[in-house]
């Protein structure tokens, strides 16, 4: 059975990816499960540049290690707020300076939107997936979902900006959604549904 190696050290992101891809006839592994200790510097100027770089570095490492029957999947995701000209964007995970500090990032976002009216608080979550096959073929998929940023945290599910991102069709924030609800409509869910079509053809 082929292995799909997730080029991420973010445990919550890995959990989501595994949940959405769990019905595929493929073994899904994290970097930790494959004993890969690589931190890829995300210095690209777009989500795609970062996702591709992560996937490519792990791909090259696995080729050099002599691995067979594998695919590498990387995800670069973030929040783009209209009023803030697309911020935090590619800096979503480190918006407040420290990587992965959800509380500080949310605090900074709310501060930057202080006094901004609801109609100007539109935002979208973006997920860019980049995948390399064992033979070096490259695939990319993008998923997006629109909503708006509320004025205080609501819900303790998900991670990142989920408790601030209000999704009108369900009348809830992403932080209030059950994992299966979120995965069915989120930016990552949308992108992975498209990627599944590709995977079913090549595995």
Residue ranges and their predicted role:
Residues 2-5, 11-203:
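Anionic-ligand binding patches
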């Amino acid at each position: 059975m082929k292995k799909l190696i997730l080029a991420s050290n973010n445990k919550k992101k890995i959990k989501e990816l595994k949940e959405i891809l769990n019905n595929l006839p493929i073994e899904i592994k994290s970097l930790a499960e494959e004993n890969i200790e690589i931190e890829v510097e995300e210095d690209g100027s777009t989500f795609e540049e970062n996702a591709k770089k992560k996937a490519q570095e792990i791909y090259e490492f696995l080729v050099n290690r002599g691995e067979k029957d594998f695919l590498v999947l990387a995800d670069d995701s973030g929040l783009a707020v209209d009023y803030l000209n697309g911020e935090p964007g590619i800096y979503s995970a480190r918006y407040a300076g420290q990587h992965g500090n959800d509380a500080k990032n949310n605090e900074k976002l709310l501060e930057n939107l202080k006094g901004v009216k609801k109609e100007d608080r539109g935002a979208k979550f973006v997920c860019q997936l980049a995948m390399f096959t064992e033979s070096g073929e490259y695939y990319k998929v993008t998923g997006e979902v629109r909503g708006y940023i509320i004025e205080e945290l609501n819900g303790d599910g998900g991670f990142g900006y989920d408790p601030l991102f209000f999704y009108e069709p369900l009348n809830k924030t992403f932080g209030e959604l059950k994992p299966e609800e979120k995965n069915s409509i989120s930016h990552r869910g949308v992108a992975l549904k498209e990627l599944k079509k590709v995977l079913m053809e090549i595995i």
